[in-house]
From Swiss-Prot:
A Pfam short name: UPF0547
Chain intervals with Basic residues compositional bias: 50-62
Start-end of Basic and acidic residues biased regions: 63-74, 99-112
Protein name, per record: UPF0547 protein C16orf87 homolog
Natural source organism: Xenopus laevis
Lineage: Eukaryota, Metazoa, Chordata, Craniata, Vertebrata
C-alpha cells in the first residue's frame, strides 16, 4: 500500500486520505495550484483566460483560389441533391415507418403504370389465367 507521512506527527497515512488522524489536512496539487494562481497578480495569460476552458478545434484559414471555390460549390450541390433524394444513412435506422410508406407509394404507382397500357384482349387472357391459378390454390386447400 502506498503511504505518505504527515508533516506534523510523522505518522504514515494512505495516499488516498485527504487528512491525517491528528487533524492535518493534506492539500492536493490541484487546490495548491488554484490557490497560488489566485494570490498572483493577473498576468497577460490570466487576464485573457480567467476560466480554464476546454480546447476547441482550431479553424484554419483557407486560401481562396478558383480550385477551392469549385470544390465548395460541388460540395454544396451534392448536399442539396442528397437532401432532396432519400439516401441511406449509416447505422441502425431509428424507425422503418418512412421506408414502408415509400414502398407502398411505389407499389401503388407501379400498379397504375402496369395496367394503364393493357389492351382488352390481354386483360381477358390474364384474367382467365388468374382464375385458373386461384382455382388450383382453392382445390389444394380443400385437400389439406
Amino acid at each position: 500500500m502506498a503511504t505518505k507521512s504527515c508533516p506534523q506527527c510523522d505518522q504514515q497515512v494512505p495516499v488516498a486520505c485527504k487528512s491525517c488522524p491528528c487533524g492535518y489536512i493534506f492539500i492536493s496539487r490541484k487546490l495548491l495550484h488554484a490557490k497560488q494562481s489566485q494570490r498572483l497578480p493577473p498576468t497577460s495569460e490570466n487576464r485573457s483566460d480567467p476560466k480554464r476552458r476546454r480546447t476547441e478545434r482550431i479553424k484554419r484559414e483557407r486560401i481562396h483560389t478558383a480550385v477551392n471555390r469549385d470544390l465548395e460549390n460541388r460540395k454544396r450541390s451534392r448536399s442539396n441533391s442528397q437532401s432532396e433524394a432519400s439516401r441511406r444513412g449509416r447505422g441502425r435506422p431509428k424507425t422503418a415507418t418512412t421506408k414502408k410508406h415509400e414502398e407502398e407509394k411505389e407499389k401503388q404507382e407501379k400498379e397504375v403504370d402496369m395496367y394503364a397500357n393493357l389492351s382488352d384482349e390481354k386483360a381477358f387472357v390474364f384474367s382467365v389465367a388468374l382464375a385458373e391459378i386461384n382455382r388450383k390454390i382453392i382445390n389444394q386447400r380443400l385437400i389439406l
